[in-house]
Amino acid sequence: MAGTRRKSLQNRQVGSLLIFLCISVGDATTIRYSVAEEMESGSFVANVAKDLGLEVGKLAARGARLVSEGNKMHFRLHRKTGDLFVKEKLDRESLCGKADPCVLHFEVVLVEPLQSFRAEVRVFDINDNAPVFLNKEPLLKIPESTPLGSRFPLQSAQDLDVGLNGLQNYTLSANGYFHLHTRFCSHGPKYAELVLNKPLDREEQPEVNLTITAVDGGSPPKSGTAHIHVVVLDVNDHVPQFSRLVYRAQVSENSPNGSLVATVTAVDLDEGTNKAITYSLAQNPEAILKTFQIDPQNGEVRLRGPLDFEAIETYDIDIQATDGGGLSAHSKVLVEVVDVNDNPPEVMVSSVSSPLPEDSPPQTVVALFTIRDRDIRVGGKVTCFLREDLPFVIKPTFGNSYSLVTDRSLDREEVSGYNITIVAMDTGPPSLSAETMIEVLISDVNDNPPIFREDSYILTVRENNSPAVFIGKVHAEDLDLGENAQITYSLLPPKNGDLSVFAYISINSGNGKLYALRTMDYEAIQDFQFVVKATDGGFLSLSSQVTVRVVVLDDNDNRPMILYPLQNGTLPCNDLVPRSAEAGYLVTKVVAVDGDSGQNSWLSYHLLKATDLGLFSVQRQNGEIHTLRQISERDPMMQKLIILVQDHGQPALSTTVSLNILLVDGFSEPYLQFQDPTKHSRKVNPSTKYLVISLVILSFLFLLSVIVIFIIHVYQKIKYREKFTIQEHFYDDCNFSNNLVQGQGNGSLSRPCPYEMCSATGTGNSEFRFLKRFMPNFPFPHATGEIKMEAGSSLPPNSDRNKSQRLEGHDQVSDDYM
């Protein structure tokens, strides 16, 4: 029955408190609510979305959640409606004990973007606990001689409620000896004292039974009772006397059990057993009895349990001294707990944004956290910092809440993630600290273009290759990740006028391998270049370019080509050599070129066959033909030579040329001597010109018919000469005898020899005539003859035989190149 009334009373109290449920917004970041304790699970508290000024749907869209500062969350949030409900029945006494007000703190955290709001709920007390006496039947022994007005402190009742619902008053049952006096304690609950109104008489009434009632201030009030049994003792004239009415002591909260707190002393003037004093902690709450103990013989008060300044700062201990006759006296020991820095700060992370894009701007919020230090006075000031130098900083938001934000730009390619250690340190002494590690991963953004390994590539392909042959590979790397690092290769179209690369080269877009689409010809294209583009697969793709040069390697696929002597198959190619020529005489020179390059174009000359192998030799490097010995009368007049011209390719290719050499008589011996044209003046002697003109005029008058044939023959040879870029200049008004042909030196002689050879066309006889000066010197209008060699000639590079020479005494006209 009593339980039913109690439950009904609680429900009425809950209802009355719900009427006064208050919601307040203290500032822009803190919302406050009030609820009554003992509300059932699921009870409505408030609408958070409305109080925060947010649309209801945004709570769910932004992933709203509650984060408690303690170990347990007592509320739950309905994301769709924004309603805040009680998660489980709230018991203010278990949550906050005797603390008043009782406030529960939590945070409402929103993401995308990251945002938090501080909230607190004050739990109001209801009168759900009645006062309780720990000792239901206390025993008091009072001598009959106790004077009137003597006070006997009683054990205080315990009421878990606070405020008006807590213990308010004591009442005593009606009796003829005592009345009740309520005392107030500054650091504890109210307690009562029995005050003797009437002298006791053991013989009249040896025992007195009393009932004490403790009443709280609830509506309706609750109460608790205890039955006091008073035993009247025989006369004991003196009561113990304490040296002090109040003892004061200070004890550090980290003092170990057994530490001495204080020593109380009392004396009794009686004799015998009435003088013996026993000390006890008789009338004290349970919290004191669990924390302190007293030696009954010497009065030493020592620690029995741990102290916690953050829980209880002071203790008011009632000490009772009882003599052997049953008389007792009371004194107080006020114990002040000294705060020490024994609680390290606590770092409580409420939200972390991970992974974090690497292009996040500075001041981007990464995490939200709160720091709490249970020490109030000592070490209560806390600082926090990052252990390492990282691109993050800590910024205070409000109160003891902080945010971790980016301080500078991030780069995933350098650091893909961070283990951020937050250090919280109080001021001590001694200074205590705590660490919390937050892992933040960095997500990739396409901010790096592909990079080729080389600044440019040079690839080689041998001519006459097979189509689709692999010629090389380009490779680029991208420092990004995933699709941002996937590279596609392509060929860029050529610029105007450049070679169309698409006709020659193809590229594998996936791996950058290059292939030749057609057969290369070194003689047509020696090299070409194009541009390869590498593009990554990012949303906003990045690219880079590299130039690739393809060098075509030469194959030995061209035989040497003979430029001189001409092999036309109609006219014999004859060179004249005087029989008086000495050993080493330069007969002629074979000139050849090769369409290949490098070693494949290096030519060497060999005497393959000859009428007399011991008469002539061919220089291997330049093709000059010299006599090995002096010509004798026994040597046949016609000497036939077959010269082999061979390149240095692998395998080597070769060409042969046939050459006829006529051994003739009649050359003047003095003029067979070799003369260096560089010793002569570059300026042609006028007397020589006059002499030549005179001879030409005489020859023209006598041999007109021969001149016509000669002109036709010269015209044909000029055509051949222009074909091989060998320039010749003839005298327009030169006249020769009708049976003479004028020539310059021998064969491919690069030096003009100052002699004239006249050969009779009709017979095998030949005659050498020295032209003496017979006319005065005067200028001649025609230039001397020139021989120009191709760059591919095998003549020695230091030879000056390919230079134009001016002869002193006559002009050079070569019949061997005609």
Curated annotation (Swiss-Prot):
Residues 789-818 are annotated as: Disordered. Residues 1-28 form the signal peptide. It is a single-pass type I membrane protein. One of its GO terms (cellular component) is plasma membrane. It is found in: Cell membrane. Keywords: Calcium, Cell adhesion, Cell membrane, Glycoprotein, Membrane, Repeat, Signal, Transmembrane, Transmembrane helix. PROSITE patterns: CADHERIN_1, CADHERIN_2. Glycans are attached at N169, N209, N257, N419, N568. Residues 29-691 are extracellular. The chain crosses the membrane at residues 692-712. The keyword Repeat applies. Residues 35-133, 138-242, 243-347, 348-452, 457-562, 577-672 form the Cadherin domain. Residues 800-818 have a biased composition (Basic and acidic residues). Residues 713-818 are cytoplasmic. SUPFAM superfamilies: Cadherin-like (SSF49313). InterPro entries: Cadherin-like_dom (IPR002126), Cadherin-like_sf (IPR015919), Cadherin_C (IPR032455), Cadherin_CS (IPR020894), Cadherin_N (IPR013164), Protocadherin/Cadherin-CA (IPR050174). GO terms for biological process: cell adhesion; homophilic cell adhesion via plasma membrane adhesion molecules; nervous system development. One of its GO terms (molecular function) is calcium ion binding. PANTHER family: CADHERIN-87A, PROTOCADHERIN BETA-1. Potential calcium-dependent cell-adhesion protein. May be involved in the establishment and maintenance of specific neuronal connections in the brain. This is Protocadherin beta-1. It comes from Homo sapiens. The lineage of its organism: Eukaryota, Metazoa, Chordata, Craniata, Vertebrata.
